[in-house]
Structures are given as structure tokens and as C-alpha cells.
């Protein structure tokens, strides 16, 4: 194996140029990385030199049917392709949303989202945030976006700062989008009241009230969820797009600083998430219990291109000749992207009921004072009980950072077995929670803690647990995993993987 690795190292070194190619090993080739080999990534999309300017929402809408409200929302958001995007997500299997925080606390006191039909009707004429102030849909937080570090020693702090910036921006946007959404809910409810007054047998006030409760139970929650899907799909995509292109314009000028990192994504949903804090993963990349291959990267980039996001580049994974994108296959038996968006909607719309001490049993009955949501009952029920949610722990993609001039790995028989000590390992505190316990066959906890966990106020809900979204079915035998970042199993696999990647 060592002979193959040496030859592979020389082959990679020959691409990096110079008379020293004959003596370069893979580490030397990494240190001599030339980002010009990847072409010019700046031509791929728009550039953002700074935060976007303010964009104010219109005043809350007047009572109107659902179709008119959806059309108005599309125009207000500048999102004419929103319905087409939602339809397309019905045929996507990628989990784009479940790693993003639900921010359900923003909706806990919203009477318009109550599970009690009487409470909803009572909130029909209450004020919404858009009544008192103009809502800036491009609102920004006070957390600045850091500049890329000059050397890899500053990468842990940089990645933590990027993540904190994105989550703060998303929170600031959602505070405004929540007010926008509640204004549309009120308009929808007032329209249903007018419909109840025009219905048959609604001559008396009591009959009209009963008819309105029936309409709330039969239509309000379902139609409000359609408004929520459109609004929050735009919020997630627009926020991820803006921050990602700003990162792209920064990181594309400093790609060499990211070469020494080892990236590990314990869960696939972390890899398919809308937001990536590092767009140039030129080190070795591990996905779930194996290593990322070129096909997986092309499929991820296909979806990112459809969403207007910058591509994720990986110098060791990409093939020399060929396209950067490839359409992913679709399986009707697997969860769909729209289902993961529905999980976010469910968490937000169900926040008042959960804050009130539990969920009412929902069915097809139409009882007085209770919202029988029929099919949308599933949309608002929590995915699991409090005990199961409490067991969910934070899973973080890990990165291995070898500083220049640092001794290398010693154990194992693979590429890192020639008198080297382990490099520094940093944990990447991300917005995703994992299932309880370590991932089966995945890497264990990092022996070095760098304190990159995202801090939040005590009592504020964190990101949605893994059980909140549909789970991807897995069949067949699992691949061998890099079980220990410092053990022989990992070295052997990594050495074999490097031979595959560098075997010309």
C-alpha cells in the first residue's frame, strides 16, 4: 500500500507543478495546492459585497380567499416561481430543512395559530405585527460575517463565526416573516367569517358562530399551512442564498487555507442542508460512515444549482474531466423535500398548542370549541413526546485540521503511518440535532474540544430534532466506517481512499 501511496503522491504533485514533483508526498501536494486548477468559480452566480438593502413588506392584506392571498404573497415576496418550487420538492428526496432551527418560540403566543377554534375566532380582530410597523423582510442581525483567516490556525473560530452569523440572520428574518404570516392568517380568517355569514341556515348569530367554527376546523389550518409553506420556503432559500454567495465571494479568494481540513458529516441531512459554512472542501471529506464520492457531490450541486446556491467544491473528490452536477434519482418510497419543509411548518404552527401544555386529540369530528383539523392534524402534531425529544443530542460535523509544520499521524498502515502524530481536530457546532447516541459505525467524540457549540438563551427552543422530519430508509449492509480518527482502521481506509482518488 505504501508504494501505491507514494506513486499517487507523485502523480498529484505533478499537477501542482515544479521540479519537486518527484519527491512530493500527498501532504506536500496539499501544501502546494493551486486553486487555479479548479477554474474561476466567481462566474457561477451573483456577488454580494455586503448585507442586502432593506425590503419592506406591504401592509397586512384585507380579507380574501386563499388563491388571492397566495398570489399577493408571491408578488410581495418577489417569489413568482414559489409554487413551481414547492411542486418540484415533491419529487426531491433531499433533506434541505430539518437541520435548520424551527424558532418555534416566535409563535408560542400567536392566538391565530391556536388549536382551539374558539381562541382562533377570538383573535380575528387582534393586531398583528404589520399593523404597527413596517416589516423589513431583509432584516439583519448584529452578528457580523467574519473574514476568512490568513492561516488554518484561525479556521475553527472562522467556521464558528460563519455559523453564528447565519443563524442570527435567519432568526432576524424569521421575526419579520412571522409577522407577515400572521397578517395573512388574519385575512384568511376574516374571509372565512364572511363566508360563514353567507352560508345557508346562518341567519342567527349562534348559527353563524357554529358555521365559522366548522370552517375553521375544516379549512383554516389547512389553508394557513399553504401560506406558511410559501412564506417560509422563500425565507429559507433567500437567506441561505444571500449568505452563501457572500461566503462564496470571500472564500473563493482564499481557497488554499481550507486545504488542510478533514471534513466529516455524520448525517446525510447535514450534507444536504441548504447552508454550508465552507464551500471549498478541498481536504478529505467523509459522509456518514464512508467517504464522499464524486457522484454524491454532483447530485448535491445539482440541487444547489436549482435553488440558486453556489456549488460546493472539493478538490480531492471532483473528477478531472466531466460535469460538476448530476441529476439525483428519485424514489417514491423515500421521504421528500416538501415533507421536511412541512416539518418546519408543523413546528411553527403547533407552537401555541405545545406551549399550552399538550396537544388535543384531533380527528374528523366537528365538535364545538375544538379544531378538528382532519388531514392537517398531522401537520401540527409533534413528531415525538418530550422524553424522546430530550434524548436528542447535538451532532456536529467534524473537521480535522493539520497545521503546517505539525508532526503527522503515526498509527496504522495507511497514508499517515510514517512517524506522524494526529493533527488538531475541531468540532463544528452546527444547527442540527442527532438521534440519541452516537451514529452507528461513525466516528466517536472528538478528543479535542474547541468550544464551537452555538450558544443560545436558556429555555429557548433549539433546532428541530432528527425525529421531527421523515427518516430516510436505509437497507443493505453498511459500509466500513472511519471508526477512530486516531486509530488504524481510519488510517487504512483513508490510505485506500487516497489511493483511489490519486491513482492516475
Swiss-Prot record:
Pfam families in alphabetical order: Alpha_TIF (PF02232)
GO cellular component terms, semicolon-separated: host cell nucleus; viral tegument
Cystine crosslinks: none
Signal peptide: none
Cell location: Virion tegument; Host nucleus
Principal location listed in the UniProt entry: virion
UniProt keyword Protein biosynthesis present: no
UniProt-listed Gene3D superfamilies: Alpha trans-inducing (Alpha-TIF)
Domain of life per record: Viruses
Residue numbers spanned by region Disordered: 354-381, 395-421, 435-486
GO MF annotations in UniProt: DNA binding
Biased composition range(s): Low complexity: 361-378, 447-460
Keywords, sorted A to Z: DNA-binding, Host nucleus, Host-virus interaction, Phosphoprotein, Transcription, Transcription regulation, Virion, Virion tegument
Biological process annotations from GO: DNA-templated viral transcription; regulation of DNA-templated transcription
Membrane-spanning parts: none
Family membership: Belongs to the herpesviridae tegument protein VP16 protein family.
Oligomer status and interactors: Associates with the VP16-induced complex; binding to host HCFC1 activates VP16 for association with the octamer motif-binding host protein POU2F1, to form a multiprotein-DNA complex responsible for activating transcription of the viral immediate early genes.
Protein function: Transcriptional activator of immediate-early (IE) gene products (alpha genes). Acts as a key activator of lytic infection by initiating the lytic program through the assembly of the transcriptional regulatory VP16-induced complex composed of VP16 and two cellular factors, HCFC1 and POU2F1. VP16-induced complex represents a regulatory switch: when it is on, it promotes IE-gene expression and thus lytic infection, and when it is off, it limits IE-gene transcription favoring latent infection. May play a role in the aggregation of tegument proteins around nucleocapsids during virus morphogenesis.
Name of the featured protein: Tegument protein VP16 homolog
Classification lineage: Viruses, Duplodnaviria, Heunggongvirae, Peploviricota, Herviviricetes
Amino acid at each position: 500500500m505504501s508504494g501505491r501511496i507514494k506513486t499517487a503522491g507523485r502523480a498529484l504533485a505533478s499537477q501542482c507543478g515544479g521540479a519537486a514533483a518527484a519527491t512530493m508526498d500527498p501532504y506536500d501536494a496539499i501544501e502546494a495546492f493551486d486553486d487555479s486548477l479548479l477554474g474561476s468559480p466567481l462566474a457561477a452566480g451573483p456577488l454580494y459585497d455586503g448585507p442586502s438593502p432593506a425590503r419592506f413588506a406591504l401592509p397586512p392584506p384585507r380579507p380574501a380567499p386563499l388563491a388571492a392571498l397566495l398570489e399577493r404573497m408571491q408578488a410581495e415576496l418577489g417569489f413568482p416561481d414559489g409554487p413551481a418550487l414547492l411542486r418540484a420538492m415533491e419529487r426531491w428526496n433531499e433533506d434541505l430543512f430539518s437541520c435548520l432551527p424551527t424558532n418555534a418560540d416566535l409563535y408560542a403566543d400567536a392566538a391565530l395559530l391556536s388549536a382551539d377554534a374558539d381562541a382562533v375566532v377570538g383573535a380575528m380582530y387582534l393586531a398583528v405585527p404589520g399593523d404597527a410597523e413596517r416589516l423589513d423582510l431583509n432584516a439583519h442581525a448584529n452578528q457580523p460575517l467574519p473574514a476568512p483567516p490568513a492561516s488554518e490556525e484561525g479556521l475553527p473560530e472562522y467556521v464558528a463565526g460563519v455559523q453564528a452569523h447565519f443563524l442570527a440572520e435567519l432568526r432576524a428574518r424569521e421575526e419579520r416573516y412571522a409577522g407577515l404570516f400572521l397578517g395573512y392568517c388574519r385575512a384568511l380568517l376574516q374571509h372565512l367569517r364572511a363566508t360563514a355569514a353567507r352560508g345557508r341556515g346562518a341567519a342567527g348569530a349562534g348559527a353563524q358562530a357554529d358555521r365559522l367554527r366548522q370552517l375553521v376546523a375544516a379549512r383554516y389550518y389547512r389553508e394557513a399551512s399553504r401560506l406558511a409553506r410559501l412564506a417560509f420556503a422563500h425565507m429559507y432559500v433567500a437567506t441561505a442564498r444571500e449568505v452563501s454567495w457572500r461566503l462564496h465571494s470571500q472564500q473563493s479568494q482564499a481557497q488554499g487555507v481550507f486545504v488542510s481540513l478533514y471534513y466529516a458529516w455524520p448525517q446525510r441531512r447535514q450534507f444536504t442542508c441548504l447552508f454550508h459554512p465552507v464551500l471549498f472542501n478541498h481536504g478529505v471529506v467523509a459522509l456518514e460512515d464512508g467517504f464522499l464520492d464524486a457522484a454524491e457531490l454532483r447530485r448535491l450541486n445539482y440541487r444547489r444549482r436549482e435553488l440558486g446556491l453556489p456549488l460546493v467544491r472539493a478538490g480531492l473528490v471532483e473528477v478531472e474531466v466531466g460535469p460538476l452536477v448530476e441529476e439525483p434519482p428519485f424514489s417514491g418510497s423515500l421521504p421528500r423535500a416538501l415533507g421536511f419543509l412541512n416539518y418546519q411548518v408543523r413546528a411553527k404552527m403547533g407552537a401555541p398548542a405545545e406551549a399550552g401544555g399538550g396537544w388535543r386529540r384531533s380527528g374528523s369530528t366537528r365538535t364545538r370549541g375544538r379544531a378538528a383539523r382532519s388531514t392537517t392534524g398531522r401537520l401540527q402534531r409533534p413528531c415525538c413526546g418530550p422524553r424522546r425529544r430530550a434524548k436528542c443530542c447535538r451532532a456536529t460535523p467534524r473537521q480535522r485540521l493539520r497545521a503546517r509544520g505539525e508532526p503527522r499521524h503515526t498509527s496504522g498502515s495507511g497514508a499517515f503511518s510514517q512517524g506522524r502524530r494526529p493533527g488538531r481536530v475541531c468540532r463544528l457546532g452546527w444547527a442540527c440535532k442527532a438521534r440519541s447516541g452516537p451514529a452507528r459505525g461513525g466516528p466517536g467524540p472528538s478528543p479535542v474540544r474547541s468550544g464551537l457549540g452555538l450558544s443560545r438563551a436558556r429555555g429557548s427552543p433549539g433546532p428541530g430534532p432528527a425525529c421531527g422530519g421523515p427518516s430516510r430508509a436505509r437497507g443493505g449492509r453498511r459500509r466500513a466506517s472511519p471508526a477512530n480518527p486516531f486509530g488504524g482502521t481510519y488510517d487504512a481506509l483513508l490510505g485506500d481512499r487516497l489511493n483511489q482518488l490519486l491513482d492516475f
